Amino acid sequence: GPSFCKADEKPCEYHSDCCNCCLSGICAPSTNWILPGCSTSSFFKI
C-alpha cells in the first residue's frame, strides 16, 4: 500500500493514520480497502 500508511492492526485515530482506520481504532489490512466500519476510498491519498 501507500508508504504513508501505518502497519496493519496498528492504532489509528484519523483516516490519515492508515489506509483503513476502522471505528474500533485499528488499521485494517491495507489490501482490503473497503471493510465494514472502515475508511472508504474518499479517505485515501489525502
From Swiss-Prot:
It is found in: Secreted. Expressed by the venom duct. Disulfide bonds join C5-C19, C12-C22, C18-C27, C21-C38. InterPro entries: Conotoxin-I_CS, Toxin_19. It comes from the Eukaryota. The keyword Disulfide bond applies. Signal peptide: none annotated. GO terms for molecular function: sodium channel regulator activity; toxin activity. GO terms for cellular component: extracellular region. The modification D-phenylalanine is found at F44. The keyword Disulfide bond applies. Belongs to the conotoxin I1 superfamily. Iota-conotoxins bind to voltage-gated sodium channels (Nav) and act as agonists by shifting the voltage-dependence of activation to more hyperpolarized levels. Produces general excitatory symptoms. This is Iota-conotoxin-like R11.7. It comes from Conus radiatus. The lineage of its organism: Eukaryota, Metazoa, Spiralia, Lophotrochozoa, Mollusca.
